[in-house]
Amino acid sequence: MKKIIEVVGAILENPNGDIFCAMRPKDKTFPGMWEFPGGKIEEGEEPKKALEREIKEELNIDIRADKVFDEVQKEYEEFIIKLSTYNCTVLDFSEFKLVEHQEFKWIKKESLMTLDWIPTDIPTVEKLIKL
């Protein structure tokens, strides 16, 4: 039986309605592909708290994970990813810096599919575009 890995992702939207997109590091799976920032839920951790922790670690910003926007399960050769993506509120962006990702962009919803997204995030991107 394949291992199920539970992960969380953040949908961060600026006042202009642009969505924060992050390019994965060269030394991780799916290098150079785009994703919603986030990460794995640690054992015993609440999903919202995991997301807030991951965003602090990866982007050095404070957020509040508000509500689940989408849930996706994607099977890969060796494991299954269960992704919960949350609408988030940025509480403090003043100390922002990329800690893990190669690059970031703020993109209009209708232009999101111009990026090369990791497979797990594509259903969420498609749902965002329809809003």
Task: Describe each PLM feature range.
Residues 7, 29, 100-101:
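A short beta-loop-beta micro-motif enriched in histidine and acidic residues
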Residues 127-131:
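C-terminal alpha-helix
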Residues 18-57:
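Conserved Nudix-box catalytic region and its N-terminal flanking loop in Nudix hydrolases
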Residues 10, 65-68:
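Generic preference for hydrophobic
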Residues 1-19, 40:
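Conserved N-terminal beta-strand and adjoining loop/helix that marks the start
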Residues 2, 11, 26-27, 73, ...:
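Short secondary-structure boundary/capping segments
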Residues 12-14, 23, 90:
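Residue-level signal for short segments within beta-strands and strand-turn junctions
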Residues 41-65, 72-124:
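Unchanged
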